[in-house]
């Protein structure tokens, strides 16, 4: 009986799998968010920020502008829904990969959940709450190191090696797109009326969220085998 007890203590605990359905939250969140800014970008006629009325253009202006004016309830709701669904999905995905060690699992969960937390923060604090809103966007950009670290962790698993390699490559790609966005972004009321910051930010957002969708799809496909 004592030997059996000792043997059980030596066996590492296998994390509880939350199921591929919850894992799809990592895809559902980005899809909802993308549809929101696509549709609302054509609907919005403008908003008032810091007492100044600003006509909206998806070419010139960032997605955050949709969190003000008539589109605010829908866009901010999408920001928050994206955060909640993505975090739930990420937790389910990495708890569903039993080959990962405890530290590696929670490192990946933390790294890939921070951008989702940033999305939720940006839904709670709009563009007029500049500092917390900017902090939320900064959390989104933690995907630059987060993709690389997660990729190296997944590369150690034979069945995830290819995806891990692609995720490592996503890190410098995200950095390039972030630099492109900041190079075209003018954080003034006048600056929102010209330029292509709306396009470059949307390219950055779409690229980041596409990797979350790919991660959820890859995990779900393997889980259903």
Region locations from a protein language model:
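N-terminal signal-anchor transmembrane alpha helix
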Residues: 17-47
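Membrane-proximal helix-loop-helix units in multi-pass membrane proteins
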Residues: 115-156
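Terminal transmembrane helical module of multi-pass membrane proteins
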Residues: 152-225
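Transmembrane alpha-helix entry/boundary detector in multi-pass membrane proteins
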Residues: 70-76, 103-108, 127-141
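Interfacial helix-start motif at the membrane-water boundary
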Residues: 61-84
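Internal transmembrane alpha-helix with an interfacial aromatic "cap," most often the third helix
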Residues: 40, 77-106, 148-158, 222
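Hydrophobic cores of alpha-helical transmembrane segments in multi-pass inner/ER membrane proteins
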Residues: 2, 78-89, 142-150, 204-220
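C-terminal ends of transmembrane alpha-helices
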Residues: 35-45, 117-129, 175-192
């Amino acid at each position: 009986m004592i030997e059996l007890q000792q043997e059980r203590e030596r066996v590492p605990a296998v994390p509880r799998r939350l199921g591929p359905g919850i894992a799809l939250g990592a895809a559902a969140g980005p899809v909802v968010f993308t549809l929101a800014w696509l549709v609302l970008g054509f609907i919005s006629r403008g908003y008032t920020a810091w007492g100044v009325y600003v006509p909206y253009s998806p070419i010139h202006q960032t997605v955050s502008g949709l969190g003000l004016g008539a589109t605010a309830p829908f866009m901010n709701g999408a920001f928050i829904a994206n955060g909640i669904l993505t975090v739930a999905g990420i937790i389910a995905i990495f708890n569903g990969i039993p080959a990962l060690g405890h530290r590696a699992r929670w490192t990946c969960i933390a790294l890939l959940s921070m951008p989702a937390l940033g999305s939720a923060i940006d839904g709670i604090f709009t563009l007029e709450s500049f500092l917390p809103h900017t902090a939320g966007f900064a959390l989104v950009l933690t995907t630059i190191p987060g993709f690389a670290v997660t990729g190296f962790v997944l590369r150690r698993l034979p069945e995830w090696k290819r995806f891990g390699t692609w995720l490592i490559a996503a890190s410098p790609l995200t950095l390039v797109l972030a630099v492109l966005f900041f190079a075209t972004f003018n954080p003034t009321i006048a600056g929102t009326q010209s330029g292509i910051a709306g396009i470059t930010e949307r390219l950055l957002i779409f690229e980041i969220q596409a990797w979350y969708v790919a991660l959820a799809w890859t995990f779900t496909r393997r889980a259903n085998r």
